[in-house]
Amino acid sequence: EFYAQFRYLVPELYRVMKPGRLLSFHCMLLPTSKARDGYIGLTDFRGELIRTFREVGWIHHSEVVIWKDPVTAMQRTKALGLLHKQIRKDSCMSRQGIPDYLITMRKPGDNPEPVSHTGEGDDIPVSMWQRFASPVWTDIDQGDTLQRQSAREDDDEKHICPLQLGVIRRAMKLWTNPGDVVLSPFAGIGSEG
């Protein structure tokens, strides 16, 4: 169901995007389960999404790994690979935590409205740029999401990978001009709005 919608959406995003502008999406690798998939491991959801965009003509522009605390993930998910007892039993079944990714795609062509950080109220100083340019963002607050207090009951809608507001703020600062319209077709719980 997801891929049917997504494969329809990606060409439409390409159609409405200005040349030279960027589209970012937040995702993670998906853990598999013995009950559902027959094995314990990971699915390269990130790679599948990138390939879907590239098939339409998007350029894989950049990506950032967003560090996540494996202890928090272990406490929340009880994933076998993150449990300390697994190291003692058989460390070949242990694994690292799963980070989030911010993947950025670019539509080919020249950007008709460059995004310039000239210091006129929209400056990005060198120290900030050095943090933003890092391939791993370690300073994103994992609890800073709109979902922080929601989705506590079994029948509540849960997101695979809740988007931290700091990631949105950083992407908007880097890649948009004041007054730009930002399209968020899935909108989730409205974090971008």
Residues covered by each model-derived region:
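Core catalytic lobe of class I
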Residues: 1-193
